[in-house]
Amino acid sequence: MRRLVLGGAAALLACAGLPAGATAAPAAPAAATATAPATPAVDWQAAGLAQARQLDLASARTGQRYRIFLSVPDTAPPPAGHPVIYVLDGNAAFPSAALMARTVARRSKVTGLHAPVVVGIGYASAEDYDEPARARDYTPPAAGKAGAGKGGADLFLDFIEQELKPLIQASTPIDTQRQALFGHSYGGLFTLHALFTRPAAFQTYVAASPSIWFAERHVLSEVPGLAAARQHQPRLLLTVGELEQAAAPPSAKAGERGAVLAQKRMVDEARDLAVRLEARKQALGLERVRVIELPRENHGSALFPALSRGLEFFLE
C-alpha cells in the first residue's frame, strides 16, 4: 500500500520511497467522516406490570419477610367474589401468571370464565429465586430428615392461612370456595404437603415438577391425611417435564448429571403418585386427579407451561 506524505521535506520523501526533488502526487480527498446523530437524552424507568401491586410483609409466624404481588381483574367480581390463585416463587412466576389471568379477563365475555386474582408469594430480594428461603419454607419437617435450613413448610402454611389470606380478602372480594395453590419444584412439594395435611386450605392444588424425592420421599407418607378431611373434595393437577428424568440429545452428558436425574425419578414419581391417588380417589375424598407430561420441557422450562395448564385446570 502506498503512503503519500505531504510536506515536501527530502528526508520524508526518501522515507516514502520518492527520489530527492520529486514531487508527491496530490492526495485524494479525505473521505467524509460519518457523524452519528446526536443521542437524545433519555431517562429509563423501571418497567412495571400493568394492574399489579406489591408490598413487603413481615410474618409473625415465620419471622421472615415476604414480597407479595397482587393482580386483580379489571372485570366486575362474580356475586361470591373473585377466584384466587396463590403462586409460589412469586418473584419469578408472578409476571407470567398475572399476564395469563389478564388474557382470561379479556376473553371473559366469549368464554364465560371469570379471571382470578393472582397473588404471588415471593421474597424481599432482587433475585428471581431466594434459594435458602424457599428451601426453608417449602420443605416439610420430614421427621428430622429434612436437614439444616429446611423443614419450615408448616409455619409457612400458617403464614398463608392466618396472615396472607385475610390481607388479600380485605383488599378485594374473594370467593373463599374457589382458591388455588400453585408451586413448582420445592414449591410443588409444598403444594402436595399442603394438600395432604390441610386439604381444606384450597380447593385446587397444582403441583408442578414436585420434588417428591425430598427426604426419602417423605411426602408420600402424608397421603393418608387426606382421608381425614374427605368432605372437602379438593382437586389435584400434577405436571412434569418430559426431560426431567433424562436429558435430551444431543445435549445429554453421561455421568453425574444423568445419574442425579435418574435417581430423582421426577417423571416416574409424578406418574406413580397420580395412579396411586386416582385408585383411592373416593376414599381419600379427591374430586379429581390429573397428571400432564409436558413435551420437551426440562425442570426449569416446565414452570411456564405448567402455569398455563394449572390456570386452565383451576378455572374449568
Can you annotate each of these PLM segments?
Residues 14-15, 24, 97, 248:
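Residue-level recognition of conserved structural "scaffold" positions that shape functional pockets
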Residues 11-12, 21, 25, 67:
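Intrinsically disordered, low-complexity, compositionally biased regions/tails
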Residues 15-16, 22, 191, 196:
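Ubiquitous "structural anchor" signal
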Residues 6-7, 17, 138-140:
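General helical structural elements
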Residues 1-13:
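N-terminal export leaders
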Residues 18-33:
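Signal peptide processing junction and immediate N-terminal pro/mature segment
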Residues 32-316:
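Non-catalytic cap/lid and distal C-terminal segments of serine-dependent acyl enzymes
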